[in-house]
Amino acid sequence: TPERVIIFASSKLKVKEVTKALKMMKLNVGEMHSDLEQAQREEVMHEFKAGRINILVATDIVARGIDIDDIRLVINYDVPHDSEDYVHRIGRTARANNDGVALTFVNEKEQSNFKQIENFLERDIYKIPVPEELGESPEYKPRSYDGRGKRNFRAKGRNTNKGSGLSLIH
């Protein structure tokens, strides 16, 4: 069977957009979100487990409670708002003593949320540079909080340090 991939997105609209783009690329993809009836969700999950769909694009409805052991790649199309949702999303890979990879796309506005996830996990998550052929990307420089609920704002500017920052910042 082909490798299975789950792509998580935080909204039904994003799930539908990503699914449409992947289908236009002739990829074998299914979608899962709350607009689907329960029977439709069960059918998509059955097709995914059977290997007839090898890419599943889903909201966090799938992050908890599915039991599929051979997912090798989880892609977070965006940063989840809740740190525990992140843990559940990436927990879909590397199950049953298998290796797996989780990638997270982080845009400039989501950097603070991503930093909160790192704080929750009590570790820095490895960051790789955005490939140059994708163009210039913002530097990974999340705004910090001063402990009283107020943000410490930093001056913004163009990042001229090519290759720095978090992988796949868009």
Please provide the spans of the model-predicted regions.
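Conserved helicase RecA-like core
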Residues: 1-138
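Intrinsically disordered, low-complexity mixed-charge segments
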Residues: 131-153
